[in-house]
């Protein structure tokens, strides 16, 4: 276990070497960052059904969620220089794209992809750009992902209707999504099938 942790810390961009002239605050900060790097590694999990790695949204009951996985992608995999795992996670994210939508998650009962997210596909673009910035690996993106990015753009412009998501680019070039009881943003709580905070239309963080 000590060897595994040492390897995790060695790969990061952060200097964890022992220095004589460190202040007490610097030592505390370094120890905090070290603990965060080690803890972050526990959220990277292998999905046997995909034969690929993914990012778990939260223990003990959350599986991988497209939105959460992509938001945490840079910190968990790029800052820590886990570039091979980063490629696997990107392949996991694009594996079940349907009509331009990255799955927001998978059913815990039958592993069925769930498409209740308007922003996961948009976050994918952002994280792929970051992957390229860190690695310069255009070849991987061009070979495995580029055509899927094109399809996302085409479908958002044309309009998407899966499970009443009703996502489309409006005439004012803002993205509209959902119905009164469709929850496609991070505020996705429902009680008895009714949205607690209806956010259909043009949510500010999506545009």
Feature names for model-found ranges:
Residues 1-207:
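Acidic, mature catalytic/reactive cores of soluble proteins
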């Amino acid at each position: 276990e000590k060897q595994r942790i040492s390897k995790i810390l060695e790969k990061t961009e952060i200097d964890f070497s022992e220095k004589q002239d460190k202040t007490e605050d610097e030592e505390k900060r370094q120890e905090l960052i070290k603990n965060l790097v080690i803890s972050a590694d526990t959220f990277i999990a292998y999905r046997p059904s995909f034969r690929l790695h993914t990012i778990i949204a939260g223990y003990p009951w959350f599986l991988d969620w497209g939105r959460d996985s992509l938001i945490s992608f840079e910190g968990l995999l790029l800052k820590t220089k886990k570039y091979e795992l980063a490629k696997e996670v990107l392949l996991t994210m694009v594996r079940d794209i349907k009509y331009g939508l990255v799955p927001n998650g998978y059913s815990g009962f039958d592993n069925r992809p769930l498409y209740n997210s308007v922003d996961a596909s948009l976050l994918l673009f952002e994280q792929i750009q970051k992957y390229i910035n860190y690695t310069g690996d255009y070849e991987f993106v061009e070979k495995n992902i580029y055509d899927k990015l094109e399809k996302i753009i085409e479908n958002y412009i044309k309009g998407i209707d899966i499970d009443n998501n009703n996502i489309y680019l409006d005439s004012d070039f803002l993205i509209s999504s959902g119905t009164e009881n469709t929850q496609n943003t991070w505020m996705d709580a429902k009680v008895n099938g009714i949205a607690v905070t209806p956010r259909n239309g043009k949510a500010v963080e999506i545009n």
